[in-house]
Structures are given as C-alpha cells and as structure tokens.
Amino acid sequence: MRKSVIATGLALMMAVPFAANAADYVIDTKGAHASINFKVSHLGYSFIKGRFNTFSGDFSYDQNNIAASKVNVVVDTRSLDSNHAERDKHIRSGDFIDAGKFNTATFTSTKVMDKGDGKLDVMGDLTLHGVTKPITIAAEFVGAGQDPWGGQRAGFIGTTRLELADFNIPVMGTSSYVDMELHVEGIKK
C-alpha cells in the first residue's frame, strides 16, 4: 500500500505542468525550432514576407512569477532573406537597414506582464539600425514539456509592429512599418 501511495505521488508530481517551474532556456536555432519573420507592404498592392536566418538568444520563464521572466536576442541583420537575392541585397544596403554598418539587432526585455490565459506583454529595448527604442511584443505561451531526447522545452509565439522611422530606416513607397512574427522554442539549460 505504501509503495502504491509513493508511486502515485511521484506520478502526480511528474504530471504537474513543466512550465510551473522557473527555468532558463537557450533558443533552439540549431534545430530550426525558432524563427524571426517579417511582413512588409510592397507598393501597397501586396506583401513581402521574409525572415532572418541567423540569430541567437536565451530566456528565463517562470509561470508562477511571470514578472521575473527575461528575454535576450541577437539578430544578424546580414542574414535577412526574402527569397529574392537582388531584393535582399537592396534591403540590406544603406537604402534601408544598412546591414554592412549595423550588422546586429538586439532585443533585451525590461518587463514581462501577465495578460492572463497564457498571453504576455514582453516590453524591452530593440536596437536596430543603430537606434534603441522601447517596443512591446504581444506574446503567447504555446506549451512546455519533455522532448523525446530527455530535454525540457518551452515555446512561445509573438508579434509586434515596428515603425521604420523610429529606427531611422528610410521609408519607401506606402509602407511605414514592418510586422514581425516570432516563433520561439527554447531548450532548458
């Protein structure tokens, strides 16, 4: 009987959602389980979608103390990829993001607010094109748990809109902003 109670107790402890514990994670870019995507208007007629292929980062997450959560990301702006080599060369040029001069963009969170139902506001400082501005990312907790290889993972999605003029990036045509969509899966350190 005692063994049965202990076994049941251990099983219940293991069934408690993984995310209930505070943990530090590295963003899984090696396994391609994270992406930084963008969408920008093309002449007001359609949209160009793309991504940054090279980035790294980490985050801390505690479902019981959301305010203690933190995020740090570094993006190689030279890795911008819209699936069109000539356009990418132009976007990376001094006409837009000037990736030769400003080859990294960084985001460092300053505050994380719990909005309920797994939704979060992640506020922080984005440095892009040599300019640092506060932004807010509307994020959502996707899930957490053990992976098939014995590690622990946690995932989030997020969106934000960046006004190009805020970062001294020239506006061309009708689009004064770029929408960002973030998919983040972290592996527990």
UniProtKB/Swiss-Prot annotation:
Subcellular localization, as worded in the UniProt entry: Periplasm
Gene Ontology CC, one term: periplasmic space
Keywords tagged on the record: Periplasm, Signal
Origin: domain of life: Bacteria
Span of the signal peptide: 1-22
Pfam family, one: YceI
Primary location class: periplasm
InterPro entries: Lipid/polyisoprenoid-bd_YceI (IPR007372), TTHA0802/YceI-like_sf (IPR036761), UPF0312/YceI (IPR023480)
Statement: the UniProt record of this protein carries the keyword Signal: yes
Entry keyword annotation includes Plastid: no
Xref: NCBIfam families: PRK03757.1 (NF002994)
Family: Belongs to the UPF0312 family. Type 1 subfamily.
Name of the protein described by the UniProt record: UPF0312 protein VVA0736
Organism: Vibrio vulnificus (strain YJ016)
Lineage, opening ranks: Bacteria, Pseudomonadati, Pseudomonadota, Gammaproteobacteria, Vibrionales
